Amino acid sequence: MNTVTGAMSALITPFRNGRLDTETYEKLIQRQIRHGMDALVPVGTTGESATLSHSEHKECIEIAVKVCQGTGIKVLAGAGSNSTLEAIDLAKFAEKMGADGILCVTPYYNKPSQEGLFQHYKAVAESVGIPLMLYNVPGRTGVNLETCTIQRLFNEVKNIYGIKEASGSMERIVELNTKIPDFAILSGEDAINYPVLANHGVGVISVIGNLLPDKISALVHKALQGELDESRRINNSLYKINKALFVESNPIPIKAAMYLAGLTPTLEYRLPLVSPSQENMRMIEETLKDYEVKA
């Protein structure tokens, strides 16, 4: 199975006058390709998937696949939902469009049991022939995908190959590595990208990568090549921007930073998300002065 790993950005979704800004979206994807990312993740948490219509969600996937076609850059399409039927529909669409894999967040709000989570992921994975990456972010979903359930999925469902682990817990990373050594683990928390990579992680799905794809690409590739000191140096150099980009709920600060850096022509969110406070906006702007944001 040709899986999706390495340096990835969880793409923002730009809006203009309340609608999807497809022109800017394509430009953002092209910029990611220029700066050495291995794969892109449209319509995840950072892409405001929860407030996109189904047609907008699918359009984002279609655009990402189209722009990446022939570049060698893979697309891991967001296909999560708290409805298994909806997740299957999105997964099938992603496969039809030519996505290289799908990223599926644990069902949120309805808080299924571990057996329910197993049956959900099994149904989604078996509906398609492309790889599926699990996505665990209990702070947002209200449910934790337990290690025993992950192990069962990995053993019983052939196209489930890895996890975006966004619990922020290194203890969890070590536990997964110890109990499921052949399972692909990717950091879903920019603050611990380097520690995850240094503990047999095989990639990251980054928010910072939207703004500084060259840095995230270098951080990941140096680690995977065994140059851990250089990877750690890059990781530590991102400390200030990481603090700034999570001063409010993601993706509020990253969209503000992209706008302030001139990478998007507008700063728009879908309600209930709104712009950062004036204080936080100033802090983001000041922090950007310490970094070179390449075109």
UniProtKB/Swiss-Prot annotation:
Species whose genome carries this gene: Wolinella succinogenes (strain ATCC 29543 / DSM 1740 / CCUG 13145 / JCM 31913 / LMG 7466 / NCTC 11488 / FDC 602W) (Vibrio succinogenes)
GO biological process, one term: diaminopimelate biosynthetic process
CDD domains named among the record's database cross-references: DHDPS
Database matches in PANTHER family: 4-HYDROXY-2-OXOGLUTARATE ALDOLASE, MITOCHONDRIAL, DIHYDRODIPICOLINATE SYNTHASE
Subcellular location: Cytoplasm
Protein name, entry field: 4-hydroxy-tetrahydrodipicolinate synthase
Disulfide bonds: none
Record keyword Isomerase present: no
NCBIfam families registered for this protein in UniProt: dapA (TIGR00674)
Pathway field: Amino-acid biosynthesis; L-lysine biosynthesis via DAP pathway; (S)-tetrahydrodipicolinate from L-aspartate: step 3/4
Similarity comment: Belongs to the DapA family.
The keyword tRNA processing appears for this protein: no
